Amino acid sequence: MHIHDKDYYPTKSLTCVQHPLDVILNNGFTAGHGSSRPAKRIETAAVLACISLETCQNEMHGGQAIPAFDFYLAPYVRMSYQEEVKNLEKLTGEDLKDLYDAPIDDYEEKPLEGLQGKARLEQHAINKTVNRVHQAMEAFIHNMNTIHSRGGNQVVFSSINYGTDTSAEGRCIMREILQ
């Protein structure tokens, strides 16, 4: 008989967990002496995903996983897009509320040349959002590759599953994390 991770058995340390990232992002969480509020934008959601993995790795050994990374983060792409539209409202003085929930086929950075009016403003907001998602995914990868964990005495032993969300927002997460 083989007892997996027998050397950790006396410590009663837990091993391997999948993180309910949606609960953490929607409700915030407390770790040690600090706490966080719910995420409202993609940058915060990506950082909280990283902190969640790191915090658990410091308390247990074994792999840490986020089973539906793109699915959990997708709503924060839309929230960030809406924030960009609100910034444009402040800048232009125009009412752009109809763009908040307008259907978006894909979040792709495209040139603004030739676009006018709301189409130009919408694409500008999409471009800014794609850049924010890219930066958030890049930060997630850098953080996961450099954060040290006490429990595993290594960088966080982690995995993320993606390809679980086919929405425009989910595809944006996947595309940007793979770049």
PLM-predicted stretches and their roles:
Residues 1-179:
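Catalytic alpha/beta active-site cores
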